[in-house]
Amino acid sequence: MKSEILRLLKSSDTYLSGQQICEQFQVSRTAVWKVMEQLKKEGYQIEAVRNKGYRLVDSPDVMSKAEIESLISTKWAGRHVVYYGETDSTNTRAKEQGERGAEHGTLVIADKQNAGKGRRGRSWESPQGTSIYMTILLRPGIMPVKAPQMTLLMAIAATQGIRRVTGLEDGIKWPNDIVSLTGKKLCGILTEMSAEIDYINYVVIGIGVNVNQELFSQEIKERATSLCLELGHKVQRSQLIAAIMESFEKC
């Protein structure tokens, strides 16, 4: 319900009465008040005015299940979000979801990874509160030999999402990177799958986007960049996640 109430607040330019929210979601005023208090604790600025109702004043760069689900307007890509404040790897968690029978389009997101994965066993720097670490679970009806094409589709979706949200021009560096116009890495993609000879059980596509990161390790600082460094200002991560998922569904 929190995601739905947050979506309603974002869609309104004026105050929403508590009674209106109660009737729409068939809950009590106390339940609505509790949701508003939870949102305030998460950093949302919400005005509550007697005889007028509630109004969303400002949304911070919050990474949460409710925030992401309130922004995504797809039919299946990212409609179900599994969120971790901290985990080892979103690809690992997404593969667990795949083994448990999670639905096509399930999106696993973390605010921090302790063992982020790159290609060829490399690690992916994943500090807290700065960037996007997410993996989408897919159950495509294609032959395993065609699975690598899905990496390219995600790369296209990511470039489109970045341009839509920020206006920044970037490019795809085959097979799995997105780079700035100066050639520095903004984003990496890792695709893994569980398959038989002629059948895919599931595919997981992990994507890491350097969004608001300003410092990189000595090892990669000469070849890595972030949207914040390129633009000169910070970007709301949840908004970018939604844009990438919407572009991916259309690919």
Task: Give the ranges of each region predicted by the language model.
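Short connector loops at helix/strand junctions that flank enzyme active sites
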Residues: 103, 127-131, 173, 184, ...
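Solvent-exposed beta-strand sheet faces enriched in polar/charged residues
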Residues: 47-49, 173, 192
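Long, positively charged amphipathic alpha-helical accessory segments at protein N-termini or as interdomain linkers
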Residues: 1-27, 37, 41-42, 143-146, ...
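Short loop/edge segments at beta-strand edges and connector loops
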Residues: 85, 172-174
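N-terminal lobe of the biotin/lipoate ligase/transferase fold
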Residues: 2-163
